[in-house]
Amino acid sequence: MNACIIVPCYNEAKRIPTPAFNSFLSKDSDTQILFVNDGSTDDTAEVLQKFRTLYPKHVEVLNLEKNLGKGNAVRMGIQNALHHTDCTVFGFLDADLSTSLEEWVALTQLITDKTEFVFGSRFKKIDNSIERKWFRFVVGRFIATAISKALNLAVYDTQCGCKLFSRNATQLAFASPFISPWLFDVELFFRLKNHYGTATFKAKSMEIPLKNWTHQEDSKIKWTYGFTMWFDLFKIKRAYS
C-alpha cells in the first residue's frame, strides 16, 4: 500500500455514502482506508465492519470506546496506521465524502521529497465546483481570516477536511494529543511551522483548490461551538507561540 486515508466516524451510520466507498474500494488497489469509529452510539460499527468484511486487504476499522472528538480520533487512526503499515502518504477525509476519495488519491502525486504537506482548499473558481451555503461561506471566511492572522501565514482554508502528509510530516504533526477537537487543523499547521521554521514550512507545503466539494447537512459541530471556538483558538495560539 502506498497511501492510507483515515476516516473519522461518529454516529455516521445513515450518512456514510456506501456506494461511493464500494466503487472506490472495488477499483483502487494501492490505498488503504482506516475507519475510526469514535465511540459511536448508532450502527456505525456494523456499517464499517461490512466494509472490512468485503475488502479485508484494503479496509481496517479502529473502534474507540470513548468519543475523543474528530482531532484525536484522527490522531489515533494515524498512530495505528504508522505502526501497522508501510505507507508513505497519510491523511484524512470526512466520512460524508464532501471531497471524493478519487480526488484525495490524485493529490498523493504531489507528495514528494520536497513537498511534505498538501491540503485542499475550498476556493471557488470558474473551473471547479464548490457548493457551500452562502451563510457558511461568509462565516467561514471570517474565521479563516482570524486563523490566518493567528498563524501569520497567508492560508486561504485551514479547515477543509482534505489533507495529506508524507510519512515524516505525519510523525511530526500527530505526535501528541490535540488541544481542540475541531480546530486541530490549526494545530497541525502550528506544529509543522514550528518544527521547520516558517520559510521551510512554506516551501514544503502546497494549498490546492479542490475540483469538487459539496457541503453535506447534519454537521457534528454544534452551533454553540461558535462561541467557544474563539477560546480554543486563543489557547492554541498561546500553546504554540
Please name every model-derived segment.
Residues 86-98:
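Short beta-strand-to-loop acidic/aromatic patch adjacent to the donor-nucleotide binding site
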Residues 1-3, 176-241:
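Hydrophobic helical membrane-anchoring modules
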Residues 12-26:
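Short, well-formed alpha-helical segments that are part of the catalytic scaffolds
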Residues 14-18, 42-51:
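Acidic helix N-cap motif at the loop->helix transition within catalytic regions
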Residues 7, 30-40, 62-64:
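Short beta-strand/loop segment that forms part of the nucleotide-sugar
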Residues 3, 31, 58-60, 115:
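Short, conserved active-site loop motifs that form the nucleotide-linked donor/cofactor pocket
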Residues 64-81, 89, 101-182, 216-224:
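Acceptor/aglycone-binding surface of glycosyltransferases and processive sugar-polymer synthases
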Residues 37-46, 97:
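A conserved acidic beta->alpha catalytic loop
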